[in-house]
Amino acid sequence: MSNGLLLWADDEMELLRAHILFLEKKGYDVVTVTNGTDAIDQCRQKTFDLILLDEMMPGLSGLETLQQIKELSPATPVVMVTKSEEENIMDQAIGS
């Protein structure tokens, strides 16, 4: 039995493998994608309990992806992951 369905969008997914394995061991089903377009496509196909979203990806940025995901699934919680400390990025993400 699954504890929940997670979507993780990050262009450096290979670096996150240990975290994904940890979540899977804890009973979560984790769908991984490497860009915003694929994340949006997955949100059209499935209902996720939580989305982990990198801010800096090729193609659509994390913020652009977040806006489209919130249009499709406004109640789904999204955690933005970024190395940036720029306040405007945080403000934009919170405002979405």
Residue ranges and their predicted role:
Residues 57:
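Receiver (REC) domain active-site loop signature in two-component systems and cognate sites
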Residues 1-5:
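Non-catalytic signal-transmission and effector/linker regions of two-component phosphorelay proteins
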Residues 41, 63-74:
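Short amphipathic alpha-helix used as the core "switch/output" element in two-component signaling
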Residues 13-31:
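Two-component/phosphorelay signaling modules centered on CheY-like receiver
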Residues 64, 85-96:
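Alpha4 helix (beta4-alpha4-beta5 surface) of REC/receiver domains from two-component response regulators
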Residues 46-52:
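Active-site beta3 strand of CheY-like receiver
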Residues 34-38, 61-64:
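Acidic catalytic/metal-coordinating carboxylates
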